[in-house]
């Protein structure tokens, strides 16, 4: 298991990782390889040399009057990888079973009552999940908003990392609506239910795609979105590269009061993950015709070669992209070698906007176990 925090604005930070009181690492990230079962207490400490360090950690912190911040958590180690595997049976459904979380970034379809399908009553995380479930049960798209927005789903069984998957080992698919010139790539993650509690609270593994490891891909990216102070306003954001921007309010197309998710109670929230280099450009040169270019493979809602279809999807209908569990990697980029998965997460992978078309936002219609479905 690889653990890594995000530090913003530290001048000269020094890091310390301890397990049960013993220091085991001094870098920003630490790879923990358990040697026994049981619960371990892990403490991460950041010490900065300035009088007033400014830093943000990706989890709750305890801050002293000194230049120090600590993060403390526990890890429960289990023995057999197969111990919580849920084999598929004749009664298993090939499609997703449940939405566990729906946390989009702000976007033109968020809170939108017409094409977005919101009712105006989605004011809690539970209501947002119910909205996403209802949409996908009808094979209708759910928008993840701008960069970093995500959805988490599970199945009524474990999906095997099987070489007998569809067309040479594709184990599952995610349905989007990409077509030539309109790709809004979503980065895909998978998880095993390692602790057996049927919840997606174990370790996520990214499925590497064609852009993984490239210099222009920012692997440790983060964006903070800020709630607008009045109706009809743009949503301001700031990333961990020092860049500021906004999700444009497009009144002529989507005039709901706010594009900031109504069920997020805080005045700002931060999303984390990789960011792909945008391939959005103005082909017309005058702002009238924008293109969202595709990526080779490995992303949801993308017109790549893993569509396994010659259909150009000119009508922007529902279209599958196929994925292999064998492409899962850990935080260090090493193969995860998962035998099966239980949960899937998709996250909008680019921070870009296309003029009057608005922000790039991944859309998903559904998730399918292709070991069972075989491309049907």
Segments predicted by a language model, with ranges:
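Acidic, glycine-anchored loop motifs typical of Ca2+
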Residues: 167, 194-203
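Extracellular Ig-like/FN3 beta-sandwich strand-entry sites
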Residues: 12, 37-41, 338-343
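Short, solvent-exposed loop/turn segments at the edges of extracellular beta-sandwich modules
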Residues: 47-64
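Surface-exposed, flexible coil segments in extracellular/virion-facing regions
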Residues: 16-33
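Solvent-exposed loop segments of extracellular immunoglobulin-like
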Residues: 8-16
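Conserved small/polar residues in nucleotide/adenosyl-binding loops
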Residues: 1-5
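A domain-level signal for the mature, folded cores of soluble proteins
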Residues: 74-184, 208-376
């Amino acid at each position: 298991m690889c653990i890594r925090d995000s530090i913003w604005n530290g001048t000269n930070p020094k890091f310390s990782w301890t397990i049960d009181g013993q220091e085991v690492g001094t870098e920003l990230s630490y790879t923990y390889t358990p040697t026994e079962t049981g619960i371990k207490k892990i403490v991460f400490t950041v010490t900065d040399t300035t009088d007033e360090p400014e830093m943000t950690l990706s989890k709750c912190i305890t801050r002293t009057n000194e230049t120090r911040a600590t993060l403390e958590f526990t890890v429960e180690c289990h023995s057999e990888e197969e111990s919580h595997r849920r084999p598929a049976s004749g009664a298993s459904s090939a499609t997703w079973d449940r939405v566990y979380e729906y946390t989009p970034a702000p976007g033109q379809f968020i809170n939108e009552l017409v094409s977005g399908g919101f009712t105006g009553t989605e004011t809690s995380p539970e209501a947002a999940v119910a909205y996403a479930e209802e949409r996908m049960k009808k094979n209708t798209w759910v928008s993840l908003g701008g960069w970093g927005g995500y959805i988490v789903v599970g199945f009524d069984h474990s999906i095997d990392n099987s070489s007998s998957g569809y067309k040479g080992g594709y184990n599952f698919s995610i349905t989007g609506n990409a077509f030539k010139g309109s790709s809004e790539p979503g980065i895909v993650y998978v998880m095993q239910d390692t602790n057996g509690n049927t919840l997606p609270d174990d370790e996520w593994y990214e499925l590497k795609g064609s852009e993984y490891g490239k210099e222009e891909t920012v692997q440790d990216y983060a964006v903070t979105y800020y709630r607008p102070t009045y109706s009809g306003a743009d949503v301001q954001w700031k990333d961990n590269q020092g860049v500021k921007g906004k999700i444009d309010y497009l009144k002529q197309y989507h005039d709901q009061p706010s594009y900031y998710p109504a069920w997020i109670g805080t005045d700002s929230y931060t999303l984390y993950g990789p960011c792909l280099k945008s391939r959005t450009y103005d082909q017309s040169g005058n702002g009238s015709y924008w293109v969202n270019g595709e990526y080779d493979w490995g992303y949801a809602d993308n017109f790549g070669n893993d569509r396994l279809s010659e259909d150009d999807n000119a009508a922007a209908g529902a279209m599958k992209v196929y994925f292999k569990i064998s492409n899962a990697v850990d935080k260090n980029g090493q193969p995860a070698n998962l035998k099966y998965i239980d949960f899937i997460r998709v996250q909008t992978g680019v921070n870009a906007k296309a003029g009057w078309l608005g922000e790039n936002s991944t859309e998903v219609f559904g998730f399918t176990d292709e070991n069972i479905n075989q491309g049907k």
